[in-house]
């Protein structure tokens, strides 16, 4: 038995009676059409909501909202991946990609003097540092309205800080970064914050600033979004006591 479509059922209802069906007064037709219009919209929305918003950039499989990320080492590009593809690059020592770590640590008692910070030659009060396995060096980046900007890092200044703090010696190359937020400290409104953060979170911070920055000072919206970013990171981070080396 063939099942009729909604449109066919509507035609039967409104057609002249030939020993079957029901004659519907003409004034009720708009209501019928409106009802089927709502039904079509509901069907389309159900279908579209079941489709994945993102796809794996390696195999094109549909992705859930929460999914793994890879970093392409040569370009420092963050790549969305499905679980099976991400597993191929889990703890990878060599290759084109590495799976991004999900570890987030807040270094509660990390100490850095203003002189040490100035020695890193970062022009703003926010930056992140990661060890590049391809370049065999520490890369310093800071967010800007134009995106991530690399800063030439004075290695002596970095080594002085790194050698005094064991947590920095344990950074996983390419996939973790030392993230510093000294904005509140510079304005005397909050303490400086220091994190070991997934590298994709650091690039997400760059994206937040690039998307919301307006004018010369950024505007209220961007500072609200920056505050929201660090509030979220604070909640997700494990707090550890960072004991400086002697």
Give the role of each language-model region.
Residues 24-104:
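N-terminal cysteine/histidine-rich coordination modules
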Residues 125-187:
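Conserved, surface-exposed functional patches that form binding/active-site neighborhoods
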Residues 160-246:
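C-terminal, charged low-complexity interaction regions
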Residues 2-4:
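Basic polycationic patches enriched in arginine
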Residues 83-149:
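Long, charge-rich boundary regions
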């Amino acid at each position: 038995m063939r099942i009729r479509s909604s449109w066919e059922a509507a035609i039967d209802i409104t057609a002249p009676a030939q020993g079957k069906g029901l004659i519907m007064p003409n004034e009720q037709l708009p209501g019928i059409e409106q009802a089927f219009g709502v039904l079509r919209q509901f069907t389309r929305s159900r279908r579209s909501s079941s489709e994945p918003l993102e796809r794996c950039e390696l195999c094109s499989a549909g992705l859930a909202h929460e999914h793994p990320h890879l970093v392409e080492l040569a370009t420092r590009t963050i790549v969305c991946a499905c679980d099976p593809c991400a597993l191929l690059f889990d703890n990878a020592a060599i290759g084109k990609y590495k799976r991004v770590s999900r570890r987030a640590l807040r270094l509660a008692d990390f100490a850095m003097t203003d002189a040490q910070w100035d020695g890193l030659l970062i022009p703003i009060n926010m930056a992140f540092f990661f060890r590049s396995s391809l370049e065999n060096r520490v890369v310093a980046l800071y967010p800007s309205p134009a995106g991530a900007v690399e800063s030439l890092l004075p290695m002596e200044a970095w080594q002085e800080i790194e050698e005094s703090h064991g947590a920095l010696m344990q950074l996983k190359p390419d996939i973790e970064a030392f993230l510093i937020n000294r904005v509140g400290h510079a304005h005397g409104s909050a303490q400086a914050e220091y994190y070991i953060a997934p590298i994709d979170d650091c690039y997400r911070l760059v994206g937040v600033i690039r998307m919301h920055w307006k004018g010369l000072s950024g505007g209220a919206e961007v500072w609200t979004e920056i505050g929201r970013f660090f509030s979220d990171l604070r909640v997700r981070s494990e707090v550890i006591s960072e004991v400086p080396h002697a």
